[in-house]
Amino acid sequence: MSLLLAGLTVLMIGDSHMSTPGYLITTLHDDLKKDGAHVYSYGACGTPSGAWMEAIRPPCGSAFRLDDGPLRVRPSEAGFTKPLPELVKLHHPDLIVVINGDTMGGYKDPAISKSWVRDEVKRLTDGIKASGAACVWVGPAWGSEGGKYGKTFAKAKAMSEYLEQIVSPCTYIDSLKMSKPGEWPTIPGDGQHFTDAGYVSWGSGIEHAIVTSDILQKIKH
């Protein structure tokens, strides 16, 4: 239980790391619930951050979990996600947690498309500003090299460092500080998505970063 999180409403939105049972929509959601928060989680696989400002059909499915309710997974053809303004009106969050980095990393490309990433991030952070909620932005974890998405430790580091520069007013959570490169096991041949044990460790690390950050001190209870 966290005295600072207890009773707060947390809205979590993210990419593929929030779209499958056993991923962060399971582990981090559970950790924040144990801290006494009301948690509403939504994942949209394969979508950049700016896509949360409109209703979209995620290319590889979506998922949602409403506080104590069950985790619901939807294939891409099942319909559209709810945009952030609608989610804010529905849940009235005190804190918005954004988990989006790998999807925009373009790890197979020679370099990060910085202007595109900046535009995507700004589109979402502008929406978060308008909501009046506090915000944290969770950057990518190390993963492993040699997977099908082209992720390498150097590219994960470059993406994390760039996101940290551009996600204001959100407080940046650097996932790379939570483990050593390759420490958390990924799905064989994947390199980007973790095994259950990896998501347990990542969820715990994010939860610790949230409850020990200054941002909770600024939220009125």
Label the predicted regions.
Residues 141-221:
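Catalytic His-Asp segment of secreted/periplasmic serine-dependent ester chemistry enzymes
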Residues 18, 22, 29-34, 89-92, ...:
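Sec-exported extracytoplasmic/periplasmic mature domains
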Residues 1-9:
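Hydrophobic alpha-helical targeting segments used for export or membrane insertion
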Residues 97-106, 124-157:
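Active-site segments of SGNH/GDSL-like serine hydrolases
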Residues 10-13, 17-111:
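Conserved SGNH/GDSL esterase-like catalytic core that processes O-acyl groups on lipids
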Residues 84-88, 121-125, 160:
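Generic structural signal for well-ordered alpha-helices
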Residues 112-122, 153-159:
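Charged helix-capping and loop-helix junction motifs
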